[in-house]
Amino acid sequence: MCGICGTLHFDPAYQVQESEVRRMAHPIIHRGPDDEGFYLNNNIGLGFRRLSIIDLHSGHQPLTNEDGTIWIIFNGEIYNFKELRKDLEAKGHRFKTHTDTETIVHLYEEYGTDCVKKLRGMFGFAIWDDRHKKLFCARDRFGIKPFFYYLDGSRFLFGSEIKNILQADDVSREIDIHVMDYYLTYGYTPIDETIYKKIKKLEPAHTLEIKAGGEPVIKRYWDINFEPDDSISEDEWCELIENKLKESIEMRMVSDVPLGAFLSGGIDSSSVVALMSQFSEQPIKTFSIGFKEAAFNELPYARDVAAMYKTDHHEKIVEPESIELLPKLVSAYDEPFADSSAIPTYYVSKFAREYVTVVLSGDGGDELFAGYDHYPMAHKIQKYNMLPDAISKNVFGALHRAIPAKVKGKGITYYLSRPKDSVSAYISKFHQTEREKLYKPNFWNAIKNNPSESYKEEILRAGSSKDLIFQMQELDMRTWLVDDILTKVDRVSMQNSLEARVPILDHEFAELSFKIPTKYKLKGKSTKYILKKAMRKYLPDSILFHKKQGFGVPLKLWFKSDLNDYMNDRLMSKNSPLYEFLEPTYVKKIIHDHQTGMRDFNFKIWTLLFLDEWLNQQPKS
């Protein structure tokens, strides 16, 4: 695992200096503390930071082919590289290292830009093709590894993190207010944009080619495609799931440095640990985070799995003082990011790094197997989408207004009163009607004709399936999974120089899941039914069927107690940069309603706190 960056100047006479690229690479030493390397050739410069995982002594980058015409910088892991290498050697290619990186160089020589279709792994890389004077960049299918870029009239800049690009001279830091609206709606920035108007993300499963002075050519090389196969029985699906997940996990246990696993006690991480134990003669090192608040603490479940498989188990408790981490989190993410589970993810990553360099995680199971609460909710909403909009709005709107705030079930009436955007509304931090009150008039007027909800509604309409659950899964994979879950884990794990591998998001395993009918994913009251059944020979029902807790933080309680003063000092300050955009009276109402117990607004409060800190960290003009 590594960090990459680079610059391509459009003036062919321009000479890139090592100091330029070194300055871009310096802020991501955490991604690669073991080595650095640079390639300079007139108007192209590539920078690299290495975290040594495979072939510890000969994995220096940038790495080239035999005649020095193809150069690569690579961040990630290719798990089928040995198989690919054999095929390439049979075609006459000669290798000088044992790294997966070199395999990509020869694949590019042999297959050109189609080389990415043969890769099984996680990656963000850039190849300089000196013969054709072009830069070829790619990102893995699910976006496990990041790739950012910046384009102006004179150059193309790129990096594993936004901070790489911000180190270059004269990079615009203009804030994109539409992206800020998207952040306040969903808690993260969208798949191809960033909070900075001119800095973009290369989307998952896409490649980018650019020559000096030209426009980037961006292409998709893989896609999510749900094609349910009803010819396969329930038991056959279980066997297919077990075998393919085993294969994926075994591939990801190849490492020349110590390796372990995150263990939350949920079905996904527990399944990963259970299957890892089938391939290791030594106890698996497992790492868990807990809280003193019982409702948020899954440590008892993690301990049960650790005891069952005799793992070398390690635990840590997170307390309210962890709020002191906020400035460091803002620096790690480079842009607003409102998932508070970044706090325990940071601590478990830092904790694990004391023992290992690589961990396997259970991320992706909820998206592939319909594990979130909103999947059953979507079924309920779908029943009422058959009603005319006017009836839904009038009947359920009136019901929503009549029900007191504390009454259970009030929320569902809101979503049913807005059937067309109920899916987006359900997963919003601030709904559209709330944002109209929260935003100052100039901010609201600038975005009201293109609100953030329309972005996800377009994805739903363009989905590959008419099945609502498949649509929801696809929406989650194209937004929440990449922009929240995978972003969260990548930034804070790499902040601690820890590589996190994601076996459930192996693309071949994912393609298998795309064929499983909805009836096997949601059955009765059970989400992820078919995965639970497939894992029953490895895990007890107490693990498989206990109530889903997620990786939440007890902010609801902390904001009423230990963090009450902190919250008020930050958000009620007249000097808060929030109030260039937001109405102080509405923020005050949010805090009041939370403190008095009228509503649980901990997600909204954390969203505002993170944005407040991010704005405070911006250079003053």
Task: State where each predicted segment sits.
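Conserved structured core elements
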Residues: 235, 239, 243, 270, ...
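Short beta-alpha connecting loops at secondary-structure transitions
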Residues: 165, 288-289, 335, 379-387
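Cysteine-centered catalytic environments shared across enzyme families
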Residues: 1-333, 345, 349, 542, ...
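Alpha-helix capping and helix-loop boundary segments enriched in small/acidic/polar residues
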Residues: 293, 317, 336-339, 386, ...
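Short low-complexity, flexible loop/linker segments enriched in glycine and/or proline
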Residues: 329-332, 353, 375-377, 558-560
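Adenosyl-5′-phosphate
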Residues: 1-4, 167, 198-204, 214-215, ...
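PAPS-dependent sulfotransferase catalytic domain
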Residues: 332, 346, 350-354, 430, ...
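Active-site adenylate/phosphate-handling loop in enzymes that bind or generate adenylated species
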Residues: 347-406, 480, 485, 489-509
